[in-house]
A protein has these predicted regions:
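C-terminal subregions of glycosyltransferases and related glycan-biosynthesis enzymes
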Residues: 203-206, 210, 216-368
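Nucleotide-sugar donor-binding/catalytic module of glycosyltransferases
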Residues: 2-245
Length: 368
């Protein structure tokens, strides 16, 4: 006679998997356990967790092994080499057995009840489900944004709503953890052309044929750990070039719709360059690498001069601007204070003119 555990395992294996939570990870041994802890107790017989490790050099394998041993619906695949985030997420969908795949980051948290809410939404049989997310600081102790989109109620998109979906959700889709997509939809679309874009999910969603049925869940289902992205060192390149080039590459959306998502050439905007200088993401190194031969003579001179502005001065001015004129920008203030460009003067400003409810906002970021 089979033991109870053997019977339970047999029952799980015989259940059709409805939802696969798909994580692509690399070198996140310091944080991935928190992410897994937020997921595993929500797993049900018809839900699995698939983790693809792109050859992490740290202790990720040993950490995940504990979860594989304890939870039958957790699967771990370690690749021999790192193929990049896009290809690794594509692999997670390939390994998945669920009808739907939730593309989950390896450092954020799934909110309590999230899987149950998504399983309920799956009953509507949409091709695509997108979920709202809240944003918190690195240790999750403070909320920076309660909602990334500001949309208060669930929204449904049908045939003919592709451009509305694009404008409503384009910016939100910079966060891959918002995406739950039907696996057959993902598999029959061109993914290879988006390898290296860092946003394979966006390419899959907005290529032709258009998504004809989508749902946006307005209640946050994920908590984002702000400032912990693997791509932090490439921030300027990503937001000035890779992201806008991807958005403006889609031929089936109007130019005004694309502009609502992102400017095609944000690097031409002097205020955008100053903001990046204030956050320590733009310097003469980026000018030399990306802008020295780009644009008009005026563009080149302007970008060069901005690179000469002391980063600490740019940061102080930016913090002053936020605490006096943008007092709802909690995330913007935290981002500035968390920068290496922030000095005691910037932190003094934040303490002296705190945003509403944020008297200790400066204490959650680094201070020099």
């Amino acid at each position: 006679m089979k033991s109870w555990s053997a019977q339970a395992a047999s029952h799980r294996s015989s259940c059709a998997i409805i939802l696969s939570v798909c994580i692509a990870t690399f070198g996140r041994g310091d944080v991935i356990a928190e992410t897994l802890d937020s997921i595993v107790d929500q797993l049900q017989d018809e839900v699995e967790l698939v983790i693809v490790d792109g050859a992490s050099p740290d202790d990720t394998k040993q950490i995940v092994a504990h979860y594989v041993e304890r939870y039958p619906n957790v699967r771990y695949v370690r690749e021999a080499t790192n193929s990049g985030v896009d290809e690794d997420y594509d692999k997670t969908v390939g390994y998945a057995r669920g009808r739907y795949c939730w593309l989950m980051p390896d450092d954020d948290l799934m909110r309590p009840g999230a899987i149950a809410r998504v399983l309920e939404a799956i009953k509507e049989d949409h091709e695509l489900i997108l979920v709202e997310a809240e944003v918190r600081i690195l240790d999750f102790s403070k909320v920076l944004e309660k909602s990334r989109t500001g949309i208060a109620e669930d929204r449904r998109y049908g045939p003919g709503d592709a451009e509305q979906l694009f404008t409503d959700m384009g910016d939100h889709l910079t966060f891959i953890g918002s995406v739950i997509i039907r696996r057959d939809v993902w598999q029959r679309r061109n993914r290879e052309m988006y390898f290296g874009s860092l946003f394979i999910h966006v390419g899959v969603i907005f290529q032709q044929p258009a998504i004809e049925s989508a749902l946006f869940i307005a209640e946050p289902q994920v908590t984002i750990r702000f400032g912990n992205a693997n791509w932090t060192s490439r921030t300027f390149e990503i937001w000035m070039f890779l992201w806008p080039e991807l958005i403006h590459s889609f031929p089936d959306f109007s130019a005004p719709a694309k502009m609502l998502v992102v400017d095609p050439e944000p690097w031409r905007n002097m205020m955008m360059l100053l903001k990046n200088r204030a956050k320590g993401r733009y310097s003469l190194s980026e000018h030399k690498l990306f802008l020295r031969r780009r644009g008009s003579v005026l563009d080149r001179c302007r970008s060069f001069l901005i690179g000469l502005v002391p980063a600490s001065l740019a940061n102080f001015i930016a913090v002053l601007y936020v605490v006096t004129l943008m007092r709802n920008s909690r995330l913007g203030l935290y981002d500035l204070l968390d920068s290496n460009s922030a000095t005691w003067a910037s932190h003094w400003l934040a303490r002296t003119f705190p945003l509403a409810g944020d008297d200790d906002m400066y204490s959650g970021s680094r201070e020099t």
